[in-house]
């Protein structure tokens, strides 16, 4: 059933670890037939493929065609044991889909991909894992396995997992699997990793993902440390589309835009002191087949706690505005510093959302957090101002 949960809208799996870009409906179809499972049948082919009929027989093909198909009773899901979260707008082939990985590396075939995300918009890949390309030990193998080859965060341009050869590592990173919550307006997941605790001051890296359904995402990367470091975010784009960067001053925040055949997405880097640059990268959907793609690298220095907030608009044809807001103590009427709490107001046409993100324990039993007239009790809260300015969707306490 996990294969159904992590299917992308195009029926392929994400290229996680040493996986290629593979349609797995043949395996799901066989499982559906063997276990007589209508949900697996939903995730499989309409009719058994040739190889499956060869294995199971002609009668199996006829019986499979007559089986019940049942849509899963979930869209988004957290597979807590493996540490994988899947946000999905619906079960159509034109759905939006985001995957967050925060689990085990998976031995020699695993990559250094803690806190990596994949993003699909309108059924088309936007952010992708680069794949594997080769098993031959060396710089090329490591470039696909290292954190910089994934859509994740690094500290001081150092890897949190260090490859020893094609299969072994001289340093590993412990994942921290945290929580997941689905509500009517928004969904949430967060996870961390301990791969930088050996740096000066130690650095705990935490990634929060807020999904405002159906087409807005907020990434909040939090780095907890007592020292000064430089942080890097990586965004590896599908090479079947074009990636452009806005000119300085053209927009309020640095912005990178992806335009593909079916998908459009804008990435806004809303934290202060960020530098975004586009670079050439590589992607290998299949073994020994390498292509060029575009990578966005975002850099920010920080002394002590540092955050990097990114807003992803998966429907950029509409008007959009983003405003950074202070978070206040509703009782004391004082603003919290950004190292403790931050807020965003995101306006899309007639919709106006307020997102409160608390980085520290600012809540108390006698107080509420407040931003732009919206008040609630929690560490991550989303408000649709037309519906609610008190309580909100509390996604994390």
Regions found by a protein language model. Name each.
Residues 87, 123, 153, 221, ...:
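Hydrophobic, well-ordered secondary-structure elements that form the walls
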Residues 187, 191-242, 299-301, 308, ...:
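Acidic, contiguous internal or C-terminal segments within carbohydrate-active enzymes
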Residues 1-127, 299-307, 322-397:
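Carbohydrate-active enzyme catalytic cores, enriched for enzymes
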Residues 112-178, 182-184:
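Active-site rim segments in enzyme catalytic domains, especially the processed small/beta chain
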Residues 74-96, 159-213:
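Extended, loop-rich substrate-binding clefts of extracytoplasmic carbohydrate-active enzymes
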Residues 91-94, 104-105, 122-126, 132-134, ...:
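Short, glycine-/Ser/Thr-/acidic-enriched flexible segments
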Residues 228-283:
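Polysaccharide-binding surfaces and accessory modules of carbohydrate-active proteins
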Residues 10-16, 94-99, 125-129, 155, ...:
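Acidic/polar loop patches that form or flank catalytic/metal-binding clefts of enzymes
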